Every structure is written in C-alpha cells, then in structure tokens.
C-alpha cells in the first residue's frame, strides 16, 4: 500500500511541477502519513490532509485500490481549493480572497454554476450571487439582519444574546407575517409563536435539557419520560393514553408499546451489535434479519418465511438482490458510485447515463428504447423525452415552474404573487 501511495504522490508531484499544473501546498515532501497523536497549538506548520487511502479490507485482503478514496488540493496559503472523489472527479471547488486569508469568495459543485460572495470591512457576507438562481443581499443592524433576494422579497431576523448564545427571537417574513421564538438562559428553545399568534411551549429538564413536555396552543400537553441514559421511555398524550419503550443494559431498544397497547419486541443475536436480528409484532409474527460486519442488511425473512438476500461490493453499494423462486436482480456502478445498470435473472438490462453534475440524463430499457432528461445549469429538469414525445418545463429565478408544455403541445403557465 505504501508503494502504491508513493507512486501516486510522485505522479501528483510531476503534475504539480508542470507549468500548466496548479501549485499546491500539499506538494511538499515533508509531511506525515498519520494524524498527530494529540491536539497541537502554535504556528500553522502547513501540513494538510492530501488523500484518504483504503489500506486494509478484510473482505478483499489482496485487492487494495490503487487510487485514494478522496483527494484534496490546497492553495499556496493552505486553503482548501478542490475535493476529488475516488474516481478522480472534482466534486467541489473553492476560490479565496487574495487579500484576506481564508475568506471564501466563490464555491461550486461539479457541473453546477459558481456561487460568489462579497463581504464588508468586518468580514460579514453582504451579497451572495447565484447564476441561474436567486441572489441575496445581507444588511446588518443593531441586533438584526435584513435579507433581500433578487425578487425584492425581504426578511428580517431579530436576535438576542451574545456569542454562542445569540438566537433569532423574531422573524419578519416576506409576506409581512411574524414568528417568534423564546429561549432559556442556556440558549434552549422554550416557546414558539406562529404567524397566527398560536403559542407552543416546551418544558425542559433542568440538567439534561431534554424536552419533558410540549403544550400546544389549545393547552393540551404531551409529556415525555426518560431513563438515566436520556432515552425516551414513555410518551403520555393529552387523552391520558400512554406509549412506552424498553431497553436492555446496553441501551438497545427491546420493546415498544403503542398507545393502543400493542407491543413490538426486538431481539439481538450479537451482544456487540445495535442492529436487531428479530422483530416480533403484537400478533406474534416474527421478522428476521442478518447483517454484515458493516451494518448492511444481508438477509430479511418476513412473517411468511420468505427470505430476501442482498449482496454488496467493497464500497457498500448493493449489487444483487435474491428473492424467492430464483428471482434476482443485479446492479452495477460507475467509478463515481452511480447506478449504471440493472439486470434481472433473464439477462434483461436497464442502463442509466448521467451528466457531469450527477443528474440522470438517460434510461435505456431492455428493448433499446431511450428516455432522456435535460437539465438547466441549476439541475432543474427542462425536458423529458420518452417514446418520441417530449414534455418541457420553464422556471423563474426562484426555481418555480412558470410554463409546462405537455407531449401534445398544450401549454400551461403559472404565475405567483410577490412572496
């Protein structure tokens, strides 16, 4: 594994040293292969996480990947510039202010337009520009923030408290309505009032902060009980009915009793696992499950005794489902982890294609018929073609559909009020 890692590092160093290649702080040869043993303080030593490698897989001991699971590049100042997935595809990118270290001025996802940010002299965001979408302006006042979008809709947030205890206590919505929130001295929510003036109160445990009761606008109260591990053990409803939960000494759920008195029980074969292997409902019917070491469902047996089995690849992707009577389906994925094929036991296959942004663009049925979906830059579907017929959609800046043209050419338009 070390040899594979070193080969990859040399390849990266070569690409980074080329005139066309981006410079990166991660190209330094003086960096460790493991994290420090503890927390360290002081000047930034310039070390950054460059890649995450799979070094041991019990299920595939002789087949380790030759590329990292994730890779990161940085600016010369050590700011995160790009994130790459295990296929080598850049999935996120960042741009920073040259005069203010660490201040992000742009960000984008793979195949999506770049969002940009502007700041005031104190480092607060004053504008967010989203191509093909809504832009936002932010104005800061004494204990309030005004947010205005490019459709001129305005919201105002009023705050109380300082530092980590600052909370939004009042919100003026674009339609003129007002909602309020109240908090205790520890910053925990204790009451909310909606736009119609209806108030909901939350009673909190003094030490744990757990919600012990919720009183609605009509004065009716739901109460909650807990055990010493802060797990919910009972819920008492306004009509006096009660539901309950029981746990074992490891904190695993062993029984649930509904407000109607019906009890569902859970059993565990592995003392170290939190995943149940048996579920018995109020009628006595039992379902059984088997799990992999990674928490993946391997088999499920229903109340009738029928068993469905599941298989996974090394990345945790489901590659096969085997049902009773030999009914099986098989799935395959591309290097980015996207489903590209589903095949049944008779060999009939459905194939899938994707854009660089990860949007599903085509579905090819077993008979070769092709259905396609086209998207705009924000990932919204603008046309769907199936069987030679096309349905198209148009949107406004807020992402709301404004026109729908059906397969027969009939068109519907939609208009919205200012908010």
Tell where the protein language model's regions lie, with residue ranges.
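Extended charged/polar low-complexity repeat regions
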Residues: 1-419
């Amino acid at each position: 594994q070390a040899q594979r890692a070193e080969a990859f590092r040399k390849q990266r160093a070569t690409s980074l040293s080329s005139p066309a290649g981006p410079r990166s702080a991660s190209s330094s040869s003086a960096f460790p292969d493991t994290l420090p043993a503890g927390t360290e303080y002081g000047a930034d030593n310039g070390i950054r996480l460059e890649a995450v490698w799979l070094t041991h897989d019990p299920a595939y001991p002789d087949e380790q990947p030759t590329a990292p699971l994730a890779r990161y590049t940085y600016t010369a100042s050590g700011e995160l510039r790009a994130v790459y997935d295990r296929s080598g595809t850049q999935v996120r990118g960042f741009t920073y202010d040259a005069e203010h270290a660490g201040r992000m001025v742009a960000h984008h996802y793979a195949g999506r337009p770049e969002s940009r940010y502007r700041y005031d002299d104190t480092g607060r965001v004053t504008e967010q520009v989203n191509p093909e979408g809504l832009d936002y302006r932010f104005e800061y006042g004494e204990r309030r923030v005004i947010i205005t979008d490019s459709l001129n809709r305005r919201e105002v947030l009023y705050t109380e408290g300082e530092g980590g205890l600052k909370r939004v206590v009042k919100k003026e919505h674009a339609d003129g309505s007002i909602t309020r929130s109240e908090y205790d001295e520890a910053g925990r929510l204790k009451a909310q009032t909606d736009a119609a003036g209806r108030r909901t109160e939350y009673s909190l445990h003094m030490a744990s902060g757990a919600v012990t009761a919720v009183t609605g606008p009509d004065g009716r109260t739901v109460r909650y009980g807990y055990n010493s591990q802060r797990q919910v053990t009972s819920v008492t409803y306004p009509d006096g009915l009660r539901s309950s939960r029981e746990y074992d000494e490891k904190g695993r759920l062993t029984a649930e009793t509904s407000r109607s008195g019906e009890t569902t029980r859970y059993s565990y074969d592995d003392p170290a696992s939190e995943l149940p292997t048996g579920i018995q409902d109020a009628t006595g019917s039992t379902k059984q499950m088997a799990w992999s070491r990674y928490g993946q469902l391997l088999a499920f047996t229903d109340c009738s005794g029928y068993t469905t089995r599941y298989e996974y690849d090394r990345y945790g992707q489901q590659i096969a489902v085997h049902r009773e009577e030999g009914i099986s389906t098989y799935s395959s994925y591309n290097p980015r982890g996207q489903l590209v094929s589903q095949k049944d036991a008779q060999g009939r296959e459905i194939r899938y294609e994707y854009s660089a942004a990860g949007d599903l663009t085509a579905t090819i049925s077993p008979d070769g018929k092709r259905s396609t979906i086209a998207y705009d830059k924000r990932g919204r579907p603008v046309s769907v073609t199936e069987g030679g017929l096309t349905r198209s959609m148009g949107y406004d800046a807020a992402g709301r559909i404004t026109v729908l043209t059906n397969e027969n050419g009939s068109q519907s338009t939609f208009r919205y009020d200012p908010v």
